[in-house]
């Protein structure tokens, strides 16, 4: 038999929808939008590191991080 705790009783409503699937697309468009924003963030970071995107007073040098 499982141990019943106060925390378990508080969290039980969160697990009551187990196995059910939201109808339609659900939150898929929101997830896609967040993935797109994350991709753009990574792309900008890569361009800064590769010096493809030139920003004034931004040195891409490990030695400059210690100053």
UniProtKB/Swiss-Prot annotation:
One Pfam family matching this protein: PsbH
UniProt subunit comment: PSII is composed of 1 copy each of membrane proteins PsbA, PsbB, PsbC, PsbD, PsbE, PsbF, PsbH, PsbI, PsbJ, PsbK, PsbL, PsbM, PsbT, PsbX, PsbY, PsbZ, Psb30/Ycf12, at least 3 peripheral proteins of the oxygen-evolving complex and a large number of cofactors. It forms dimeric complexes.
Metal-binding listed as a keyword: no
Transmembrane segments: 29-49
Cellular location(s): Plastid, Chloroplast thylakoid membrane
Job description of the protein: One of the components of the core complex of photosystem II (PSII), required for its stability and/or assembly. PSII is a light-driven water:plastoquinone oxidoreductase that uses light energy to abstract electrons from H(2)O, generating O(2) and a proton gradient subsequently used for ATP formation. It consists of a core antenna complex that captures photons, and an electron transfer chain that converts photonic excitation into a charge separation.
Organism of this sequence: Guillardia theta
Keyword terms of this UniProt record: Chloroplast, Membrane, Photosynthesis, Photosystem II, Plastid, Thylakoid, Transmembrane, Transmembrane helix
Protein name, UniProt field: Photosystem II reaction center protein H
Gene3D superfamilies with a match to the protein in the record: Photosystem II reaction center protein H
GO biological process terms, semicolon-separated: photosynthesis; protein stabilization
InterPro entries for the chain: PSII_PsbH, PSII_PsbH_sf
An annotated GO cellular component: photosystem II
GO MF annotation list: phosphate ion binding
Family of this protein: Belongs to the PsbH family.
Annotated membrane topology: Single-pass membrane protein
């Amino acid at each position: 038999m499982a141990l019943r705790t106060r925390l378990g009783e508080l969290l039980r409503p969160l697990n009551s929808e187990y196995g059910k699937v939201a109808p339609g697309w659900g939150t898929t468009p929101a997830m896609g939008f967040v993935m797109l924003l994350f991709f753009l963030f990574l792309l900008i970071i890569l361009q800064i590191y590769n010096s493809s995107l030139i920003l004034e007073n931004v040195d891409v040098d490990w030695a400059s991080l210690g100053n």
